Amino acid sequence: MSAIVDIIGREILDSRGNPTVECDVLLESGTMGRAAVPSGASTGSREAIELRDGEAGRYNGKGVLKAVEHINTEISEAIMGLDASEQAFLDKTLLELDGTDNKSRLGANAMLAVSMAVAKAAAEEAGLPLYRYFGGSGAMQLPVPMMNIVNGGAHANNSLDIQEFMIVPVSQPTFREALRCGAEVFHALKKILSDRGMSTAVGDEGGFAPNFGSNDECLSTILQAIEKAGYRAGEDVLLALDCAASEFYHDGKYQLAGEGLQLSSAEFTDYLATLADKFPIVSIEDGMHESDWDGWKLLTDRLGKKVQLVGDDLFVTNTRILKEGIEKGIANSILIKINQIGTLTETFAAIEMAKRAGYTAVISHRSGETEDSTIADIAVGLNAGQIKTGSLSRSDRISKYNQLLRIEEDLGDIASYPGKSAFYNLR
């Protein structure tokens, strides 16, 4: 039995300089697991609640000492002595202890830190790498990365309304070569921007944040960077967008302030369809407001067979909402953010539900990250096939890519890189 003998919660800082929760779990054998939780900037209204202190004079109200106290008192008391290898039972214990639908009492940040740290300790005790502990012998597929090389929206201080412009390397034989491709395009883009006298400062997720005149201009410039780096747009490298449309939906209209447009759901569907026709876009995330299900249905019917349509704010890693979306034919993919739901067991259930329905699952970071690389192990362990973890700068992003390199090396000859086949939801 891998009995839990000590639990320590603490307040640390994330990549934006805001407090977040870290947890250490010590087992009877002496093995230890440590996990830190991320935090989002653009968040879905139905996400599990991240508990903040609200004390204005300390970290502008964003302290997490209450969440840490929950770990060090009642959570510790509830799970002390439990078997760390019984993840589902441990997470069930946390859920029952919290007793709310949205984890608002204990805080999803407190619960997730414990859930992750326990899994890491159990993997260490079993002598297994974390991805193997999660996925068993079937874990051998590396994910295709969606690399956010231009930031807009809530992730940057510029005129772009769309939040993320991503490159997706798909023709490479290995993850290592895909990562190299992404890095080379990133540096080619930096040179293009510099030559134009545009800003090469980066946003929260490590992508550049220049003031392009339009989304079209941004996408055209990325195509130039792909070619400049020696790759073929549409063959070697595809494009992906995260609209984060909930952020610019006001008074029933999609208000693209940077372009002076106010569009209905049907008009915004036309707008996105035009971009998808003009550029090699393989994936669009949050293309409609999270509550605009009629708009989502329009978008899915229009583009769902040729473009991956990812629900982030739409589904918030929640199986109940995902099930309803599947039944109504909304979207064809789910973004998986571990802190949206708050336990590993619930996270894994969402991934499995998506796969059973023919939806893809994209494992994702948050804009406020730490050096914790657990999501890399989740992506491989559950054979998710896709990961979204930022640009090719900032160590809080690179830590996940570097972990994937280590996993690929550990797998050796049995490692596979799916490329375009990762988008099995497109027919």
Swiss-Prot record:
The keyword Secreted applies. Its main location: cytoplasm. It holds the Pfam family Enolase_N. Keywords: Cytoplasm, Glycolysis, Lyase, Magnesium, Metal-binding, Secreted. Mg(2+) binds at D242, E285, D312. Pathway: Carbohydrate degradation; glycolysis; pyruvate from D-glyceraldehyde 3-phosphate: step 4/5. The active site is at E205 (proton donor), K337 (proton acceptor). InterPro entries: Enolase, Enolase-like_C_sf, Enolase-like_N, Enolase_C, Enolase_CS, Enolase_N. One of its GO terms (cellular component) is cell surface. One of its GO terms (molecular function) is magnesium ion binding. Its EC number is 4.2.1.11. Its cofactor is Mg(2+). The keyword Lyase applies. (2R)-2-phosphoglycerate binds at Q163, K337, R366, S367, K388. It is found in: Cytoplasm; Secreted; Cell surface. It catalyses: (2R)-2-phosphoglycerate = phosphoenolpyruvate + H2O. Binds a second Mg(2+) ion via substrate during catalysis. SMART domains: Enolase_C (SM01192), Enolase_N (SM01193). It is an enzyme of class 4 (lyase). It comes from the Bacteria. NCBIfam families: eno (TIGR01060). Catalyzes the reversible conversion of 2-phosphoglycerate (2-PG) into phosphoenolpyruvate (PEP). It is essential for the degradation of carbohydrates via glycolysis. Belongs to the enolase family. HAMAP family: Enolase (MF_00318). This is Enolase. It comes from Burkholderia cenocepacia (strain HI2424). The gene is eno.
